[in-house]
């Protein structure tokens, strides 16, 4: 049997392998598939080359999973509206996978990660037209909350959706989805097997917060309100 795997605008044909599973079984074992998804993401994040000094450990988030499920049930092979992808004040990113047969979640995540074959750290996609956004979202250092869901849309159409909070793939930084260096180099006292466990609880609203804080410190309420991560997270990953 041939399985058709689609990643956004990229279509590829895969041979059926041992990675295929019964969809009902995969969907019903909620705790099992949550652990499989989180463990797979963290394993891949630990294995990046070059290694990452600021890679956060991912954890499951039920709100992100609910948002992913609502979108998966629409059976639409397109990204959900950004305003529907939020967890608290965090905006979330999204990866989508479609197949003509069910896949194990570990296989879905691996397919996204495999775009690394056309990605060069510090340069970006190579050749430039290559699709690599799924890979960069999987390994985006700051994305640490994860929620995923799937839907059987027809006998030959299965949709898988993961949402990542806060969102990755920030314009201007896509070529460096994390900071290279020794594992946990930026979090030596908050490290779990190569991944940082100290995410900042705040999120900056401006892209130039480091410059603003360096120049003006955090002396005004405006800067503190717009740049809370830079102002208040001195030892956490931001």
Curated annotation (Swiss-Prot):
GO terms for cellular component: extracellular region. Blocks olfactory (CNGA2) and retinal (CNGA1) CNG channel currents. Does not affect neither depolarization- nor caffeine-induced contraction of smooth muscle. Residues 38-164 form the SCP domain. Residues 200-233 form the ShKT domain. Residues 20-28 form a propeptide. It comes from the Eukaryota. This is Cysteine-rich venom protein pseudechetoxin-like. Disulfide bonds join 75-153, 92-165, 148-162, 184-191, 187-196, 200-233, 209-227, 218-231. One of its GO terms (molecular function) is toxin activity. Residues 1-19 form the signal peptide. It comes from Pseudonaja textilis.
